[in-house]
Amino acid sequence: MTTFKEAMTFKDVAVVFTEEELGLLDLAQRKLYRDVMLENFRNLLSVGHQAFHRDTFHFLREEKIWMMKTAIQREGNSGDKIQTEMETVSEAGTHQEWSFQQIWEKIASDLTRSQDLMINSSQFSKEGDFPCQTEAGLSVIHTRQKSSQGNGYKPSFSDVSHFDFHQQLHSGEKSHTCDECGKNFCYISALRIHQRVHMGEKCYKCDVCGKEFSQSSHLQTHQRVHTGEKPFKCVECGKGFSRRSALNVHHKLHTGEKPYNCEECGKAFIHDSQLQEHQRIHTGEKPFKCDICGKSFCGRSRLNRHSMVHTAEKPFRCDTCDKSFRQRSALNSHRMIHTGEKPYKCEECGKGFICRRDLYTHHMVHTGEKPYNCKECGKSFRWASCLLKHQRVHSGEKPFKCEECGKGFYTNSQCYSHQRSHSGEKPYKCVECGKGYKRRLDLDFHQRVHTGEKLYNCKECGKSFSRAPCLLKHERLHSGEKPFQCEECGKRFTQNSHLHSHQRVHTGEKPYKCEKCGKGYNSKFNLDMHQKVHTGERPYNCKECGKSFGWASCLLKHQRLHSGEKPFKCEECGKRFTQNSQLHSHQRVHTGEKPYKCDECGKGFSWSSTRLTHQRRHSRETPLKCEQHGKNIVQNSFSKVQEKVHSVEKPYKCEDCGKGYNRRLNLDMHQRVHMGEKTWKCRECDMCFSQASSLRLHQNVHVGEKP
């Protein structure tokens, strides 16, 4: 038996995968494979391996199979020199001479390039070699041993160590163990690469930004950030990626595949790492800690984003408006604001969104899903971050402080929005009307005014709302829920803002000042109503009588006079009222409630006006007196009216007959005589009247009352 034994070559330690086998490996296994191939090649160079004899490698690159053949060493006057030939299988006959250094660079480049630059499943071309398939799916090259008794062949190895190494592939044995974490490896080179993680060793440095890496493959992947290279393209949408693993994850978006399920809540994820990070929400584990402030996070990516808060680093800048961002994804989402692009569409209603997260949030509006529950009050939330913010309400924690006034806030976004009140900045502009807003959320809500969009419907009465909080407040009218209680008087309210306005009644605070007359109000709503006195603005007109009002609510109350509608009913006596405030005042007759107390004697009154009249007796205030006939008048407003009666001044003139009046109301009633207008109609006999008072007197005829 004759054995052909040659010097150790790269093929003796090479492990070759087919393209199908490579597809079964995950990202970590592929990286390990490339690092092992590089390590073996370096070891050969370190022991003085200078020639490849007749070894052949096949590389899969850009849909071409490259076959690299090492030519024999040629001697010349210039000394030893290695020449190689690169031959394309699909283009036979094309040759190119390469130096030894170029061979090394080519191998190193192809072995460590990302997943698409992988070794092909073609066999070594040396006659007498054949592959052996192992249980792990590895294809290992054996050298054949020629028998002296015929043409038969059987596998043999150059030495015992190679045979032992080969046997480990069949048995699945991993004889090299890491002392730090106990992880096992088949190759000593793989163990050495792994140990760099524990030692913190980073041998490979980026020339552009100086960032260091423990593996050369990680460096090459990182360099694509600077070059912008994205060699992995999605067949479905054409989107490019710098890593094959990112492309594989992206493919699942098109297929809808979510193989990783949470056992706690059943939520599914595309990637295993996403599931692991999600599970920490249930366990409360936060292994990633900030060295600056000690804050902990459940994911490394969240820690990295947080670290930029301390450094104030915002490396990604928008070319259109020069705004900077900490993350590239945030920059990409921001650019869509300028382009108007909304690539993520809701299948239910067709609404478009800039980022996928907004689409996920919107989907929960249709499904009603709220998986995160507060242990304190039982309230449910769609997102864990919203639950975290809500829990600060119970704990009272306000970690975000305004540098101008020191005010604390539950969330960072609230603090940013508040700081714009100091600067006056309103960066979010409406394209339709040009109105500016401090928050994007406010702009989104405002734009629904132009579109008329009302996504949120009340299940009780079918009324629609443009915002979910508005629907929530409306539903409390049906349920009667009033969760906000005043600690001073015990009065309850449906909205927190109503409670704040009410509390100013006790404190006497009036922070909203009129710029015209300096009068103060405890709510902005009351200030807005007052300012229409100065402007004279009355945009809401009654179609029945033409009377104008400054507010829609005032018009609604007025229209009930024409229709006779009295929707507010007293449960005690059945009497009905046109306004809710009238009902509340009336109910005090039955309850005996007297909330208005006299500061002098402590006497209680049902109405503020009666208390004011009573207090004048203590102060012995001289009542207002009519100068014409000496009649005492209690109210100041009545005094002004009385003075106009006796004065010659009648500023309101009728254009038809020239008759003058001291009040606009009297002129309006008089003009109905000329127009023949009778807007007040009796429902019993259809008789019409020009004044409401005349109608009320007439209705007494039907009920049998004597005025």
From Swiss-Prot:
Domain KRAB: 8-78
Pfam family membership, one: KRAB
Keyword terms, alphabetized: DNA-binding, Isopeptide bond, Metal-binding, Nucleus, Repeat, Repressor, Transcription, Transcription regulation, Ubl conjugation, Zinc, Zinc-finger
InterPro entries the UniProt entry points to: KRAB, KRAB_dom_sf, Znf_C2H2_sf, Znf_C2H2_type
Compartments reported by the entry: Nucleus
SUPFAM superfamilies, A to Z: beta-beta-alpha zinc fingers, KRAB domain (Kruppel-associated box)
Zinc fingers typed C2H2-type, residue spans: 176-198, 204-226, 232-254, 260-282, 288-310, 316-338, 344-366, 372-394, 400-422, 428-450, 456-478, 484-506, 512-534, 540-562, 568-590, 596-618, 652-674, 680-702
Tissue/organ expression: Ubiquitous. Mainly expressed in fetal tissues.
Biological process (GO), any one: regulation of transcription by RNA polymerase II
Entry function: May be involved in transcriptional regulation as a transcriptional repressor. The DEPDC1A-ZNF224 complex may play a critical role in bladder carcinogenesis by repressing the transcription of the A20 gene, leading to transport of NF-KB protein into the nucleus, resulting in suppression of apoptosis of bladder cancer cells.
Protein name: Zinc finger protein 224
Classification lineage: Eukaryota, Metazoa, Chordata, Craniata, Vertebrata
